[in-house]
Amino acid sequence: MIGSVKRPVVSCVLPEFDFTESTGLGKKSSSVKLPVNFGAFGSGGGEVKLGFLAPIKATEGSKTSSFQVNGKVDNFRHLQPSDCNSNSDSSLNNCNGFPGKKILQTTTVGNSTNILWHKCAVEKSERQEPLQQRGCVIWITGLSGSGKSTLACALSRGLHAKGKLTYILDGDNVRHGLNSDLSFKAEDRAENIRRIGEVAKLFADAGVICIASLISPYRKPPDACRSLLPEGDFIEVFMDVPLKVCEARDPKGLYKLARAGKIKGFTGIDDPYEPPLKSEIVLHQKLGMCDSPCDLADIVISYLEENGYLKA
């Protein structure tokens, strides 16, 4: 950041912009006059700050314009104005803003309009190479008290010992921040899982082995998360532990509160748990017959090794 600027320093120079050498490229920051109707960077008076690197002017006939964010130059694909359909939500509505010029193709996803997917030049396979592993999501599901978080930590420790990079998205931990606005109503639980699924997908795309540990009481939301990832990269681990075993453990005292009516909608008591139907790994535990967390983690690690996830 430069001076009192409170947002990323961004510069954009297209052929239609009035760019001159008088911008003072040798200085730490300068400005470029933009068209009055240019609103990509807010409602400022047609002026945008520059910094770190000199702006790059697109040459006549070029198919890209150059953008700088904190000194990083990125190129965006353009369309000819003839490609623009002003009646379509998948393109810019105002095609006449720069007559005869090329425009970026945008789209609508959910409630987000006029957005553009920027494909990075560094592919997932390249990000995985220095890590010597394949990014994936290990989704641990089961009743409260079934040992999900314990397994997640043991698995993370076991993989760390092998020099592998992991990150745990724990159901409770995520509700301390990202999902602190969500309750435990059915619709909020579904949104909780959706958000965690999207974050887990980003970790996997970065080459990280992401371990998501949460109850996931209904089948549909985790299945939707599975569809976000390439085939095989969503590995569901079902902690198949009977309710009576989980209730006997009751590490947080939640079953006792639920039985006393002090917690409503508690999974396994007055709200259903739908066991997954197509888990890659099912870990069975019974009363008096429970493997250690390290033994369970070894089962998951063996699966990862056999399926090539612990090498690039």
Swiss-Prot record:
One of its GO terms (biological process) is sulfate assimilation. It comes from the Eukaryota. Keywords: Amino-acid biosynthesis, ATP-binding, Chloroplast, Cysteine biosynthesis, Kinase, Nucleotide-binding, Phosphoprotein, Plastid, Transferase, Transit peptide. It holds the Pfam family APS_kinase. GO terms for molecular function: adenylylsulfate kinase activity; ATP binding. ATP binds at residues 142-149. The active site is at residue 216. InterPro entries: APS_kinase (IPR002891), P-loop_NTPase (IPR027417). Pathway: Sulfur metabolism; hydrogen sulfide biosynthesis; sulfite from sulfate: step 2/3. GO terms for cellular component: chloroplast. It catalyses: adenosine 5'-phosphosulfate + ATP = 3'-phosphoadenylyl sulfate + ADP + H(+). It is found in: Plastid, Chloroplast. Its EC number is 2.7.1.25. Belongs to the APS kinase family. NCBIfam families: apsK, PRK03846.1. PANTHER family: ADENYLYL-SULFATE KINASE 1, CHLOROPLASTIC (PTHR11055:SF63), BIFUNCTIONAL 3'-PHOSPHOADENOSINE 5'-PHOSPHOSULFATE SYNTHASE (PTHR11055). Catalyzes the synthesis of activated sulfate. This is Adenylyl-sulfate kinase, chloroplastic.
